[in-house]
Amino acid sequence: MSVTRTLRETDRRLTGRTASRVPAGCGKVLSAVEECAESSKLWCCAAVVMAACGGRRGRLAAAAGLTALAVAQLAANGVCKQLADRPRPPKELIPHDEVEDRPDSSSFPSGHTAAAVAFTAAVAPTVPAAGALCAVPAALIAVERVQSGAHYPSDVVAGAVIGLGSAWLTRNAPRSAARLWAS
């Protein structure tokens, strides 16, 4: 069996298991968190609170978080989704009615997860407490994307990798550019 086929089958199996094992009450909480994060509302609100209440460090963290989020959204939704035309998980894998409310865009990668991880990872080095608080909804969003049938687990993992890369780039590119400029 090929590696690609094994990955596809594992993705399908994990999608079905995740969607069927989340209790109904938890599914509603996951959906509510995802709704708050839709169009990056949750992360923009978090940035406003950090900038308003966190002093200079809060403003730096908010700027880093929003910049990383924008980079992640561009990479995930503007580039990767356009290149990878992967269909959403089939409805028969999802044993609940939330499967009807899914985007029409490519499944790969998860833009919600990319944005959540990017914001969280960019904020955490400057304001660790805010990073820890943001990690909770970020993790819930990642689980929700699979549980709702919007994504396969590999889409979510790819989104998380894009988010981490965007945060790293946001935090390190300015220093690298300054060093190059100075030399």
Describe each PLM feature range.
Residues M50-A75:
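Interfacial segments of alpha-helical transmembrane regions
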Residues R21, R56, G78, Q82-K91, ...:
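Membrane-interface elements of multi-pass transporters and channels
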Residues C36-L42, L66, A130-V136:
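Alpha-helical transmembrane segments
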Residues G25-C26, R56-A61, P90, V127-A132, ...:
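Membrane-helix interface segments
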Residues C45, A75-A76, F119, V136:
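Hydrophobic/aromatic residues in alpha-helical transmembrane segments
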Residues V49, V71, A75-C80, A84, ...:
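Alpha-helical membrane-inserting segments
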Residues L93-S183:
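Membrane-embedded catalytic cores of phosphoryl/pyrophosphoryl-handling enzymes
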Residues M1-C44, N77-S105:
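N-terminal transmembrane-helix/juxtamembrane module of multi-pass inner/ER membrane proteins
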